[in-house]
Amino acid sequence: MAVYRLCVTTGSYLKAGTLDNIYATLVGTCGESPKQKLDRVGRDFASGSVQKYKVRCEAELGEILLLRLHKERFAFFCKDPWYCSRICVTAPDGSAVHFPCYQWIDGYCTVELRPGTARTICQDSLPLLLDHRKRELQARQECYRWKIFAPGFPRMVDVSSFQEMESDKKFALTKTVPCAEQDDNSGNRYLPGFPMKIDIPSLLHMEPNIRYSATKTASLIFNALPASFGMKIRGLLDRKGSWKRLDDIRNIFWCHKTFTSEYVTEHWCEDSFFGYQYLNGVNPVMLHCLSSLPSKLPVTNDMVAPLLGPGTCLQTELERGHIFLADYWILAEAPVHCINGLQQYVTAPLCLLWLNPQGVLLPLAIQLSQTPGPESPIFLPTDCELDWLLAKTWVRNSEFLVHENNTHFLCTHLLCEAFSMATLRQLPLCHPVYKLLLPHTRYTLQVNTIARATLLNPDGLVDKVTSIGRQGLIYLMSTGLAHFTYTDFCLPDSIRARGVLTIPNYHYRDDGLKIWAAIERFVSEIVSYYYPSDASVQQDCELQAWVGEIFAQAFLGRESSGFPSRLCTPGELVKYLTAIIFNCSAQHAAVNSGQHDFGAWMPNAPSSMRQPPPQTKGDTTMKSYLDTLPEVNTTCRNLLLFWLVSQEPKDQRPLGTYPDEHFTEEAPRQSIAAFQNCLAQISKDIRERNQSLALPYAYLDPPLIENSVSI
């Protein structure tokens, strides 16, 4: 008689335990054990519990290949899900085999687990294990299916595929959702207290293993409801018309101020702060260094000489690499939208900036269209104060549109969703790349589904607050993806290509490159352990299918993007994985976390403009300026969104935090520890630097970076 000892750990999530019966079967090279119930005196499989059981066999099973968990009904109780963290099996000879699980087991089913040792398909030769890989991927591909949201968009998860699964896989709360109004058959409706329609059905059927935890869901709701109801009670969400005074905007979130939001309120109209935001604001990727001026921006030396001062000229500064351009060409053909029944307006400005001898980036000239001419004057710092302020505000509106739609949602949320989907569909649990990337996909499918249900749906928040609306968003993102390249995706390459390596006080660049290097070193150690040669990469058909699916579904097979459709060397794999992890974590933090800080003062980030751009100088008054800014209710709706997305809900996992131990070998565990130590040193350096800054830059402080796109 051979006795195997099982140590079963149940997750500590709310309702992670189960009353259902759990049975186990061990499968080894010499046979398999009888199906045996895991039962002991008292409650089994309670949340957070660690319990030990015995499985008896007539003879030893040899090397353990699989552990089957069978979940079946207990008496008359209703079925409930069980979150199994991990199981350790100790053989009669004392050797231990670890089985990571870290998933919800829902309904009555059988789940097969492999030992925690990561293996590529080339390292498996047993038909049993090869068949297990194949069946696992077939099941996942049936569950996680691709869907087209709009032409030219990265493909997204098809939530309806979860609805088609058996009823015990659904999260059915339809009858518990209080709906104030439903005026169509799509499920697009208003909820009490929320200022936009929500696509309810798409939120109710998330597969358990990609759904927010109860803690995160509760935290998100508790962040949203008080702010939304507070505005509703004060009548702000229903108040149309212009702001009477700029100072009135201060009172929207009087209890939700931050040091940075207060700093922005005090300094937003200063030219130096306008330039600072191109380096360390929420969209720090727009600047390109110029060696000559584009013909569409006919700025002359006489125009800017008063700012440049004696001893230099525009041509000299161009040759020195001190002139930069922010070009919003992508907005030139963007459709416009109506808000509160009124036509809104969009411009495609060109903003020329100069790095002065003191290392301060200053705006030199602004043209509010892509076509120069008498009706498109070039605004200068020497113009009257309100004319110059209005021109800068138009640029800030363009910044808002490009940042929110492309830099933020397209390049982090949507692309990271495609990475998550391909990882789930093409890599089995035992694959080393799956183990590496899984923590960086956490909650991404859920948060993007929420975004599509609340922001991108018809009459959702995008239609309520932005000058381009939902149709403009679709245009902007599809155009942005058509021009997005692998160089843009890889931070070091992007920095070099944009010519911004030497700008001082560019904290996003400095902190980002440090984090990139730390991730690259960590990934390199993992890859070298599992892929010792070029052939090991080229012959991994699962890895190649994963890369190919990302190329086809995220980048629509566009060769000009420069994204690989196949990987040939470990070095190429390291760069690709580094870029994915960086963009799922650090890049998202850089472009997301500061939205409330920099947008709470609405004139610094207006979501829409209500008057056409000026065609002459000298006509701007404070009244006309206020009449150009968004209306009161539009402002409040947008600031509510800024507040929510800047407040990371509970259940956070900072970059480098891996509580789920998917890697069980010693080498990758040591690499994880070294990665964490490196991030700790980066954090220490950032905090020391910030002590001497008037406005600290903390968005890339590793403890403040979430592992994944989860909000």
UniProtKB/Swiss-Prot annotation:
The protein's superkingdom reads Eukaryota
What EC identifiers does the entry list? 4.2.1.152, 5.4.4.7
Q: Which Pfam families match?
A: Lipoxygenase, PLAT
Q: Which parts of the sequence belong to the Lipoxygenase domain?
A: 120-711
> As annotated in Swiss-Prot or TrEMBL, what is the tissue specificity of this protein?
Skin specific.
Q: Required cofactors, per record?
A: Fe cation
Q: Which SUPFAM superfamilies match?
A: Lipase/lipooxygenase domain (PLAT/LH2 domain), Lipoxigenase
Report the catalytic activity. Answer: a hydroperoxyeicosatetraenoate = a hydroxy-epoxy-eicosatetraenoate; (8S)-hydroperoxy-(5Z,9E,11Z,14Z)-eicosatetraenoate = (10R)-hydroxy-(8S,9S)-epoxy-(5Z,11Z,14Z)-eicosatrienoate; (12R)-hydroperoxy-(5Z,8Z,10E,14Z)-eicosatetraenoate = (8R)-hydroxy-(11R,12R)-epoxy-(5Z,9E,14Z)-eicosatrienoate; (12S)-hydroperoxy-(5Z,8Z,10E,14Z)-eicosatetraenoate = (8R)-hydroxy-(11S,12S)-epoxy-(5Z,9E,14Z)-eicosatrienoate
Assigned keywords, A-Z = Cytoplasm, Dioxygenase, Fatty acid metabolism, Iron, Isomerase, Lipid metabolism, Lyase, Metal-binding, Oxidoreductase
Task: Show where the PLAT domain sits.
Answer: 2-119
Q: Which GO terms describe its cellular component?
A: cytoplasm; membrane
Residue sites binding Fe cation per the record: 408, 413, 588, 592, 711
Q: What subcellular compartments does it reside in?
A: Cytoplasm
One example GO MF annotation: oxidoreductase activity, acting on single donors with incorporation of molecular oxygen, incorporation of two atoms of oxygen
**Pathway membership:** Lipid metabolism; hydroperoxy eicosatetraenoic acid biosynthesis; Lipid metabolism; sphingolipid metabolism
Q: What this chain does, per the record?
A: Non-heme iron-containing lipoxygenase which is atypical in that it displays a prominent hydroperoxide isomerase activity and a reduced lipoxygenases activity. The hydroperoxide isomerase activity catalyzes the isomerization of hydroperoxides, derived from arachidonic and linoleic acid by ALOX12B, into hepoxilin-type epoxyalcohols and ketones. In presence of oxygen, oxygenates polyunsaturated fatty acids, including arachidonic acid, to produce fatty acid hydroperoxides.
> What is this protein's record name?
Hydroperoxide isomerase ALOXE3
Q: Which organism is it from?
A: Mus musculus (Mouse)
Q: Gene encoding this chain? A: Aloxe3
